[in-house]
């Protein structure tokens, strides 16, 4: 299993763009970038399929456009710098209760305490003033990379996880 890691003080702007263009991705736990062709799960190697989109060339389906419009009409959407606080930890804890694949108990365990290595933003979805979903992503000069999305399971039928990906 070939894998490489890059440790820098920051992965921002054109540095992040360069690493993403070469097939590198963020490692959450240690604030570095990595690339690999396989991952090991329970002593079995599985191939990794890195997904990238040239955003300007993406054509949304009618169903995706409908989802975007429905979420925008029903909820308020905001973008801001990513910070781990009690509000966002609450949503993560609710999501973790149904997302059995998540091993870490808190976002602080996943991201660590230093959230300055990357220029990370968060999209927040609110029902009135209550946070119901969040999606974090790193920003370069010409690229973005999704990091993690989570939502209140009580809102599952509204496809907020899909909205955050689209």
Where are these regions (language model features)?
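Acyl-donor-binding surface of acyltransferase catalytic domains
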Residues: 2-76
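Short alpha-helical interface elements
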Residues: 40-44, 116-117, 162
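Conserved acetyl-CoA-binding loop-helix of GNAT-fold acetyltransferases
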Residues: 157-166
